[in-house]
Amino acid sequence: MGKKKNSKAYSEELTDTTRPLLEFRYGNPLFAIACHPEQSVIVSGLATGHMFCHKYNAAELKEAQLKRLRKHDAGSKDDRKKLWEVVEVPGVETSGVSLLWTTKRHKGSVRCICFDADGTHIYSVGTDNVLKKADTLTGKVVKKCVLDPGQNVKYTKLVKSATHPLVLLGDENGNVTVLNSESLEQTNLIKSIHNGDAINDIFHFAKKSVYRYISLGQTTLAHWDSRESNEGDFAIAADDKQAKRKVILSDDQEDEILCGTFVDPEDGEVLVCGMGEGVLTVWRPKKNGLADQLTRIKVKKNESIDCIVPTLEDDGCVWCGCSDGNIYKVHVNRGTIIEVRKHSKLDEVTFLDLDSEYRLLSGGLDKAKLWDSEKSEQLTPGSDADDRVSNSSPSAGKSSESDSNDSENDATSSGGSSDEDSSSDESEHSDASDVEEELVGLTREQIIAELDKDLVEESEDVEDVRSQRKRKHGADLPTNANGKKQKGKNIKPERSMKTHGIRRFEGL
């Protein structure tokens, strides 16, 4: 039996070399953030009630990063220097990032924001219990309503249906308010879903019905129809297991369920939930109707998984934002962590989202980072990629690019530029996760050269075997763009057969 690997060392081995493309630093606590589903736009809401809408050019940001890399000393061992764009909020514009508008949208703090399916409108709700619908590109409010006048209700989750004109609001009392997204009029109220505890998350259960949703709260998972009230459920005895209820609750998980998502929202086969004890629980609706979890995946002991999003790359993985400041990429079927990114050493990861090109956006109370889809070593100009090795497992990534009360016309645009050198703030050097290690010993090319040297002596035998195989099968050996690597894979079995098998003496 092999020696048990130290968990800390193992985590360091998985640390990814991907750098952020962009970082936002906020002067006030960040309470909500979301990416536009079709454009390279990010909207953030702060504790002061202000909202900021930024547009970014990913290609320009990447080019600026390459320029900084060229200036960076190739021989320097300090690869932790920030080489990405840093934008102060509020502050002036920088290269590749422009401020479309900013406004004080709510009295008190902004609690939740979300886009509609095509990103035309953005919805926001604040501690003033006012829901506002605004044009995304101008910031102008087109509709608003006051929720529960006179009630001291705090909203925790805001969701817009991707297919129907529905807006759902979850609050701290465990209620879900359903409104028409066009008129902002209430159409349904589902009360006290999780025994009166706060709604931690809401997401679509599309495989079951376009009107069905899943909510998470305290230690239970529930699913329900957004069109139907659950008033009749309170007349059913708690111990009556046969009665049909409008809200179907899972078993008590004995650990707080903080967030959840489907690994593939289109097929709806596997659901994962982030727990307060640092594990992912795996649920399969077809197995037991979401009555209980089936398996658990350990992510980080004594920490909590506060947010989660699917990668949407058909790789069976999800991104998990953890209270230790790390982002973990978890392969659900394997039950393993395959990548780790460091968001911050001091702050929790409380927000995760994907931009229009599936780049990851992570956020905490003081900053947000938009991560590049390429590894750092792929971006390094003039460096020998064969002499460097990434500590992370490979991941499949997409390399393409993402009123002041009632007079909401005060949404203003601002211009200006900032010094790029500000992005190298030394106090934040330790936050970056792009440190690479030198490979000790022979490089990959040197190893290949040594293998080729050994193969020269037996090249004739190899060719004979190849010709025999061609005659036998009538086809060439498979090749790909990386000819050297494929060649090594094809020759090695032949060498082992001739060295250790009887086939070597077939001609005698």
UniProtKB/Swiss-Prot annotation:
It comes from Eremothecium gossypii (strain ATCC 10895 / CBS 109.51 / FGSC 9923 / NRRL Y-1056) (Yeast). Gene3D superfamilies: YVTN repeat-like/Quinoprotein amine dehydrogenase (2.130.10.10). Its main location: nucleus. WD repeats lie at residues 46-94, 105-144, 150-189, 194-234, 252-293, 344-381. Belongs to the WD repeat WDR55 family. The keyword Cell membrane does not apply. One of its GO terms (biological process) is rRNA processing. It comes from the Eukaryota. GO terms for cellular component: nucleolus. Transmembrane segments: none annotated. Residues 372-508 are annotated as: Disordered. It holds the Pfam family WD40. This is WD repeat-containing protein JIP5. It is found in: Nucleus, Nucleolus. InterPro entries: WD40/YVTN_repeat-like_dom_sf, WD40_repeat_dom_sf, WD40_rpt, WDR55. Residues 491-508 have a biased composition (Basic and acidic residues). The gene is JIP5. The keyword Flavoprotein does not apply. Keywords: Nucleus, Repeat, WD repeat.
